[in-house]
Amino acid sequence: GGFPEMFASQLEANKSMLAAIAQAARQGMPIFAECGGYMYLGQCLKDFEDRIFNMTGILPQQVQMNKKLQMVGYVEAELLQDCCIGQAGMKLKGHEFHFSAEIPGVGDVVGNRAFSFTRMRNNAVYPGGFVSDKGNVLGSYLHIHFAGCVEAATAFVGSCWNYNISRQDK
């Protein structure tokens, strides 16, 4: 998480960190990112001045900052893909609060959408987030309320444990 738009230049310049995270993802390390972390896992970030900064490129989305709040509110989310926090069909609750938005149409053709979201206040349904092809990387704007779905936290710890065990065998 955090505010990558405030540090986009420094994040882009830290090539060794970008490469290390991308390599860890390719090697199957479980990576779970919410909001700012989701932005960092994407292809690029367009800031308030329309400057474009490359991010890790692990997930297909490109995001742009907006002066107006893009989303705030509680949502229910259903996992659409098996991934590091659970199986397809798992229901989670949480909230979204962000000034950035995915650039429309980018990523949708090649990406594996992570969630089907339902806004609690008006029942609007929309897709969100992405899961990597291997299922080890999950990113979205959703801030999960893990007390409402302990199974997701347990699954993520299990994914991390299994990854650690697999690394010991090498």
Please provide the spans of the model-predicted regions.
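Extended, subdomain-level signal for the structured scaffold at the beginning of enzyme domains
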Residues: 3-4, 148
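Short acidic (Asp/Glu) and glycine-rich catalytic loops that position anionic groups and cofactors
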Residues: 1-3, 37, 135-138
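Amide-donor transfer/coupling interface in amidating biosynthetic enzymes
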Residues: 64-170
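Cysteine-nucleophile active-site neighborhood
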Residues: 4-85, 156
